[in-house]
Amino acid sequence: VPIFAGDVAFRMTDFAARNAARAGVAAAIELKTVDALQRSAPAERGTLMLNPPYGERIDPKGSRGDGAGRRAPPTAARESFEDGASAHEFFTRLATHWKRAYPGWTAWVLSPDMKLPQAMRLKESRRVPMWNGPIECRLFRFDLVAGSMREP
């Protein structure tokens, strides 16, 4: 199964490429530095996985003495993205892009925002409760179709 991965920041794709090489799986992964709002579907069908920034980080073990797993202060990622868009605007644009560029695909999004499906204007087909360290999240599944799933 081919794996396509990407990030808007070269630093992150370079980091992922080096980790994939160390793990011996680099040949199975196609990495691109690209904006998620610009990337076209690399195959007819597939699965998208997204763990977007949501303004909270989990401190790595030992970073503050015995504070392993505590939340770090929120970052600006909660309020805005690199192009200045708010999180709400970004997710609305992302959902529109996915419907146009990825019909027939499945998307999974990990988020602590329980209202994310409404912000994206997508109906989730699954909502799986999860914890990302101390952060309560949901893993949302969206079955992507071109246009709208609403009955006329």
Listing of model-derived features with the role each one plays in the protein:
Residues 1-152:
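Class I S-adenosyl-L-methionine-dependent methyltransferase catalytic core
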